[in-house]
Amino acid sequence: MRRSKLSSILVTGTLASLLALTACGGNDNGGADNNNGANNGGDNNEDVADNGDNNAEDNGEEAAGEDGLYSIDDFDNVTSNEGEAIDGGSITFGLVSDTAFEGTLNYNFYSGNPDVQVIQWFDEPLLTWDENYVYTNDGAATYETSEDGSVFTFTIRDNVNWHDGEPVTAEDWLFAHEVIGHPDYDGPRYGADFTNIEGMEEYHNGEADTISGIEVIDEKTLEITYLNVSPSLVTGSVWTYPLAKHIFGDMEVADMSSSDAVRQNPIGFGPFEVDSIVPGESVVFTKNEDYWRGEPNLDEVVLRVVNPSTVVQELQSGGVDLVSSFPVDQFPENAEMSNVEWLGIVDRAYTYIGFKLGHWDAEAGENVSDPDMKMADVELRKAMWHAVDNTTVGERFYNGLRWNGTTLIPPSHPEFHDETNEGREYDPELANQILDEAGYEDVTGDGFRETPDGEELVINFASMTGGDIAEPLARYYVQSWEQIGLNVDLQMLEFNTFYDLVEEDDEGIDIYQGAWGVGIDVDPTGLWGRTAPFNYTRYTNEENDRLLAEGVSEDAFDLDYRAEVYNEWQEFMVEEIPAFPTLYRANLVPVNNRVLNYAIGDGHGVYLNELAVTAEEAESAE
């Protein structure tokens, strides 16, 4: 991608001053939002393992190149420690966040990434998937399909039980669908994956008392009939999270997400069970001796929230054994930390700038675009993308461990990410030209452009707090837009407040900086579709509808055809720009040298019940 002269000198100006503010490290801007299904991404789950030697090279750290940049290709995703495990033991997991976790601790109701970092320890999907994101028969349930692919028959293993000893049943699996499809459901899950089930829309609209396409065959067997057969059905579109009917069955659906069964006494069938909760701060888990994969090696896991500003000290002292993620801007100065092994993967996530283009119609269950919105002019959106230099941001803020985003399908899905699509290059001169030609002129002489109608233009920009880098990075974007004559007013908000306001289409937000965790299935419908609650831009377009539908059509079983469709969709979104990606990202996780059998990413076959330690106490850094 061509870089203008301004890109090369930026470090001596605005960006250099921001770097000076962050020289002591810090975190990026908070967590990632989630998409329309827990197994469809957004949670960035970590299931990891460890190396052993204290030598930096042997501990998974790769030296930076001569340019001071690191590459995610130099990291492994499974620990390599070969020490002997002790009996039992306890580990401490740090949930890295500058805010409390919200506490909606059930896959059927949660919406924020911090909550899923808690849930993953005590609950899990009934189906697992391989490194290509295809469902396997190695999980708590197995599946078969009819010859035409429209009917799935699921069988839950006999030894899969809730933590209270009750069996996980087909009725529980059906019940989850009934709750999510209910008109009073207040969570974010209901969307295209559910409306594709035969009879779901009739049930949701109150025209039927049952979902005709879901049948309980026996206690452990469930059959679901889907309306449209697509490759997504085996890569993420099946809802694989049951809901314990013996606990929730007598509750009103509208009361479930705020109930003690979600907030104080959550239940699952995973390797650990919840022993105690300090709301928003910490959770103590004890092992589930009857876990279906086998009794866990560890006796206990302690999860506590760790501020990004103190995560290094916690790791060095052995206060935590491993963390949800590590602020990559702090990696260079800690790459040789002697008591940890560094794991890394290309994250299924990206940061982005979103433009508010409409509102959510709750009654109709769809997004509605509004041509009168402040950011409705695509020429204004084009100029704002051209005005920011994310290549330099990735290099200078993150030493290459975040890099310029080009399309809305990240490289975590290499078979569908279009490497030939360069997005929109950094070119402030072109940005100025676009605004000039579109009629945005400085009428009043105050240095800021007015609208083509001569009215004042103030763009309200919301971004998340989250450590030392969050605000300077957001201010870099503001200053970049000011350099092309746009008056942008920045508001920094903590994670929960930020998403409350963005979800509610608050009138005080015109643009926002968010982060998406994408699904195991590449299908972007859950993030950018007409009926997707998580489509926070509220963008709709018939061509967008068509391309998203083509991507999950029967023709899309041909992977080459599907890739072609998604290449076309990526290019379409580069032209339409309801949002633009800013950075793709590496996910780095340091793991204490005493930890055995931990892995991050997908399809590695290492599970949390295998997690073990070689010593009673965590190793401290030298």
Please describe what each predicted stretch is.
Residues 1-10:
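Bacterial Sec-dependent N-terminal signal peptides
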Residues 86-90, 121, 138-140, 149-151, ...:
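Extracytoplasmic
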Residues 591-622:
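Long beta-strand-rich cores associated with HINT superfamily self-processing modules
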Residues 25-70:
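Short, low-complexity, disordered segments immediately C-terminal to signal peptides
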Residues 3-4, 131, 157-186, 271-397, ...:
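Extracytoplasmic/periplasmic ligand-capture domains
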